[in-house]
Every structure is written in C-alpha cells, then in structure tokens.
C-alpha cells in the first residue's frame, strides 16, 4: 500500500482512532482519484503500488519517482478531502492533482 492508515493519520495530525473509518474511506477516495487523474492503467498502478524494484514498464529510478509523485499527490488529496469534507471544490482539487501528476499523465515517468 502506497500510504498506510498510520502514515495518513500522521499527515493529518490525528492522534486517536476515532476517525479511522472516515480516514480509510477518504484515503481510498484520494488514491482512486489520483490514479484516475494520472490516467494510470491497472497494470501501471499495480507496479507503482507494489514493493517491486523494477517491472516491464518501469526501471528502478522510474518506479521510485512514480511512487514519490503518487505519494505526494495522494497525501495532498487526502488532506484536502479531510479538511473540506463539507464543502470540497473538486474542480480545484483535480486541477492541482493534474499539475502534481503531470509527468505520470504524460508518460514522462
């Protein structure tokens, strides 16, 4: 898993388990949103979301870069969705994610 619940809670600065269910749901949504915005195929996402050091599609450096990029994007999306649960502007979020994920979207990584 690219971002664990523990990492997500640390990023959100949540110390208790009271919101674990909400955070898990938002983390799943943030991850899916980033995969969709990056236009990753299931095979590409499987490579990035695994512990592999290389694959048919990516060498080690590319996998590392893709994982770091996706991790930042997922955490950003998670934070946004968590903070704006009531009034999220998904257009603004999507535009920011497109910028963050540009290299993946265009196949540069």
Placement of each model-derived feature along the sequence:
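Divalent metal-cofactor coordination and adjacent catalytic microenvironments
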Residues: 1-109
